[in-house]
Regions:
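Short helix-capping/linker segments at secondary-structure and domain boundaries
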Residues: 55-61, 110-112, 144-151, 237-241
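Single conserved hydrophobic/aromatic residue that forms the stacking wall/gate
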Residues: 1-7, 11
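Carboxylate- and glycine-rich phosphate/diphosphate-binding segment that chelates Mg2+/Mn2+
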Residues: 9-110, 218
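C-terminal charged capping/lid subdomain of soluble metabolic enzymes
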Residues: 153, 163-245
């Protein structure tokens, strides 16, 4: 899959064809040693978004895609912050590449969801880096989904080692809280203040058209619910630390 956005067109389009699927993937951690910490953090959270959105997919999962998503989440929780702090560590770089590969395999089968649908609009309209957009939007959308995703998020919470006791709701909420905490520790903002009020109707139109029926989302958004999420993304910008961009 690839993406294209012409200079005169702010809509981010997906290009998908079997001919674009690689026969081999070369995972060489030495190629990522020079990746800046900021980009390491946001691309790692992008991989986490791939894994989680694939895992909570409503219909398209297989046993293999579920397993790969679980393994990706575990690897990312164990290695991303280490890669952010110690970019020269080839082992954690290798683990993150494996995690990204597994998450990519999972979402190629099971799809993504509303996080990506909204993130793509921000990339097209404001040139927001894709990983940064996903990192900020992911916990907000997961909170909005609520009980619809508690059982699966509770399972991921256990796998990630965040919390192993309590109810599904408690574990799911702890998992989401840890995503927020990971973002904060890596200097990723809580929200975006650049989303213009006049752009919101277009954002909603594009996001809804992409997510439904293309993605097997656990919660199908209407315009009002999508607007609520976008309002939250904007409101949370007030909580950003001074160093956050």
């Amino acid at each position: 899959q690839g993406y294209s956005s012409a200079a005169s067109d702010v809509y981010k389009r997906q290009l998908m064809d079997l001919k674009l699927m690689p026969l081999y993937a070369i995972l060489d951690p030495e190629l990522t040693v020079g990746l800046p910490p900021r980009t390491t953090a946001t691309t790692g959270m992008d991989a986490l978004t791939h894994a989680i959105e694939a895992y909570i997919s409503w219909t398209y999962n297989t046993k293999e895609s579920l397993r790969l998503a679980e393994e990706a989440v575990k690897l990312i929780f164990d290695n991303l912050e280490l890669a952010y702090q110690h970019g020269e560590d080839l082992k954690v770089r290798e683990n993150m590449m494996i995690a990204a590969f597994k998450a990519g395999f999972a979402f190629s089968r099971a799809g993504v969801g509303n996080v990506h649908a909204i993130a793509h609009t921000l990339g097209g309209l404001y040139n927001t880096p894709h990983g940064l957009a996903n990192a900020v939007i992911l916990p907000i959308v997961l909170e909005d989904y609520g009980e619809a995703v508690y059982p699966k998020l509770a399972r991921l919470c256990e796998i990630a080692g965040v919390k192993t006791d309590g109810t599904d709701a408690e574990k799911a909420q702890a998992f989401i809280a840890e995503i927020y905490a990971m973002n904060e520790r890596m200097g990723i903002p809580k929200g975006f203040d650049f989303i213009k009020e006049e752009d919101i109707p277009q954002i909603i139109t594009w996001a809804l058209a992409e997510a439904n029926p293309n993605y097997p989302v656990p919660v199908v958004y209407n315009a009002a619910r999508c607007r609520k999420v976008i309002d939250t993304i904007r409101a949370k910008a007030a909580e950003n630390l001074p160093a956050e961009a």
